[in-house]
Amino acid sequence: MGKVNEVLFMNRGEGEISYAQNSAFTQKVASMAMPALENAVETLFSKDFHLLQALTAADLGCAAGPNTFAVISTIKRMMEKKCRELYCQTLELQVYLNDLFGNDFNTLFKGLSSQVVGNKCEEVSCYVMGVPGSFHGRLFPRNSLHLVHSSYSVHWLTQAPKGLTSREGLALNKGKIYISKTSPPVVKKAYLSQFHEDFTMFLNARSQEVVPNGCMVLILHGRQSSDPSEMESCFTWELLAIAIAELVSQGLIDKDKLDTFNVPSYWPSLEEVKDIVERDGSFTIDHLEGFELDSLEMQEDDKWVRGDKFAKMVRAFTEPIISNQFGQEIMDKLYDKFTHILVSDLEAELPKTTSIILVLSKIVG
């Protein structure tokens, strides 16, 4: 697999398998987390920030779907509310949209309508800029951000976990692409270690960029269980591994490619997130919660229609990194196989998905 920061992005464009057309689930999660963002803006203005004429915010891992537009609109709306309450004449909002270099910034900025940013004659003038780069390192000057938002991005890792091959060079997680019930304990340990390292780097970078008393609102995939091999966090990757294994058995994929591939993502528990934040010591936890949603919440009665929609959603955020390892030419076959496996599982109850909302404040001093 190539370097993660070169191959990790959502499906581009606006076609039927694009992220822009298949982000309904993340939109629902974002809408449920919106009160946390509103409270964060409210909190900022309850401190000394009401003296500012401009608020600087960043949406990290913004992708190219409509979620980031809702974030901008929410911040702007809350600022307009505070502007009226505080009898401000005008305020300015500077928003930086960040993602890795492969992100579809063209589709993103094409979707930025006047309804999102408004015009420069309103109570709050909004200015938006793109910032390509990895959020695991520094992106902005010191003490330059008042508010940081990130939705469904922080659980991605900078690389596949280290230490997943033996001294003899043999793969330790054969036949799987993520943690599973059959994975040896070293796999779970390696994934947690990599997440700890990467999330700590994220917090360290933000601790230098966020002003004292500034806020961060982070939404990420997570789990309720202390066991990372439970299906609530492994379901999608387990089904993909089964689909890939079937193509291996048909001679369409080399077995070694499956055995040596491990997804650079980790869905942590609330306790793991809390522990890392407290160890870092740069931020206080204002709010931490996990909430469950159905993995497949759709109105259609036809299980094939539901299965196809879920498969397209999964394809939208997994295809670039999966195709880099296994080849673009077999992607249609792979996700067709994934759909068939999924539909057979629809007879049983599917696991719920846990999302974590984490609100942090930068410690003064």
From Swiss-Prot:
The keyword Metal-binding applies. Optimum pH is 8.0-8.5. The keyword Metal-binding applies. Pathway: Alkaloid biosynthesis. Gene3D superfamilies: Methyltransferase, alpha-helical capping domain, Vaccinia Virus protein VP39. Binds 1 Mg(2+) ion per subunit. The record marks H149, H221, S265, M313, Q328 as: Involved in substrate discrimination. One of its GO terms (biological process) is methylation. Involved in the biosynthesis of caffeine. Catalyzes the conversion of 7-methylxanthine (7mX) to theobromine, and, to some extent, the conversion of paraxanthine to caffeine, but seems not able to convert theobromine to caffeine. Belongs to the methyltransferase superfamily. Type-7 methyltransferase family. This is 7-methylxanthine methyltransferase PCS1.
